[in-house]
């Protein structure tokens, strides 16, 4: 999942990987080569629906969701499952059943990842 913002000169990357416990949304600034993590999905979840709005009445929005919280891989150690499982069950109505959407917002100058 990727989205490019021409105004911010930034590539936003939403992970869907089984290579680690938590997936993230990243921002890669083309002009500086700087990579920053913006948000983390719950253990086992994938980041989905990545969107960006460069200018909506002077504000910039980065939108993302996640799904399949608790969808662990065979490499996920039991200690992680034991630690994350109760929170996922409580907050997202059970393993692999919950999802959420959200956004990060700010004025376009405030959303710049470097000065």
Kindly give the residue locations of the regions a language model identified.
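Sequence/structural signature of beta-propeller domains
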Residues: 1-115
């Amino acid at each position: 999942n990727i989205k490019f913002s021409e105004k911010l000169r930034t590539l936003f990357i939403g992970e869907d990987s089984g290579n680690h416990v938590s997936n993230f949304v990243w921002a890669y600034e083309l002009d500086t080569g700087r990579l920053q993590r913006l948000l983390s999905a719950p253990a086992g979840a994938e980041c989905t629906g990545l969107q960006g709005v460069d200018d909506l009445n002077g504000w910039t929005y980065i939108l993302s969701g996640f799904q399949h919280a608790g969808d662990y891989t065979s490499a996920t150690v039991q200690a992680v499952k034991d630690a994350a499982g109760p929170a996922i069950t409580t907050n997202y109505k059970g393993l692999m059943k919950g999802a959420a959407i959200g956004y990060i917002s700010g004025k376009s100058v405030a959303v710049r990842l470097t000065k």
